[in-house]
Amino acid sequence: MEKQFELLYHDLERNHWWFNSRRKQVIDMAKPKKGEKILDVGCASGLLLEDLTKIGMSAAQLNGIDVSDEAILKCHQKGFKNTYVMDGADIQLPLESFDLLIASDCLEHIENDEKALNNWYSLLKKGGRIVVFVPAFMSLWSPHDEVNYHFRRYTNNELVEKAKMAGFKIQRKGYWNFFLFLPIWLVRKLKNLAGGEKLSPEEMDSDLKPAPAPVNAVLKLILSLEKFLLKAIDLPVGVSTYFVGTK
């Protein structure tokens, strides 16, 4: 992604409603266990790794990779030494060595996503688990995707079919951020109609910006309610889509 947005995200990701709620949802679906060897693909500055330590995981069992030198430096500064600068489609770590692999908003940045999924499959132990979140629906495509260097957005069927082709057994699939889907869709459509799709790279902007504290709190509350609902049901649409699988 553009460097200016990477730096902004590093500042935002701890408390911003989107990043904060997504980490909680991912952890809830991943069900990590003490002693498991865990890999976070696209670990950024290590906030998910931090959250995992807060629920009993040790830094020694946590691993991460990211394409950003600066992100991995931040991980090292936080004490996560098993973090490396690597390409998410060609992770050079021991095969069949991880119990759990998490990739939240990473696969869409990789041009050859099928190669990446095959690579991730090879890294998991037999019976190992994977949780993947990606942006949903090309109808939501906007300058936000451009500045973040996304290659695509997915339907759940597209994501699941590619996961199955790599060999994963699907345990759960669906969408996340259901309640905010329509407002976000409308905002992006209006931006595109206003000429957002014709902006130069210098004029494009990301949707993720600091939110006023009351707004941030309300949006976190909405996604907390959704997390509760997702314990019992799957949702038909959302801003993101996911699958949970096993090897």
Residue positions per predicted region:
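A short His-aromatic
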Residues: 105-109
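Conserved N-terminal segment of class I S-adenosyl-L-methionine
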Residues: 1-96, 100-104, 117, 212, ...
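A C-terminal cap/extension of S-adenosyl-L-methionine-dependent methyltransferases
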Residues: 2, 180-247
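A structural helix-start
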Residues: 69, 110-114, 134
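A short glycine-rich, Lys/Arg-flanked "PGG" loop and its adjoining helix->strand segment in the class I
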Residues: 114-129
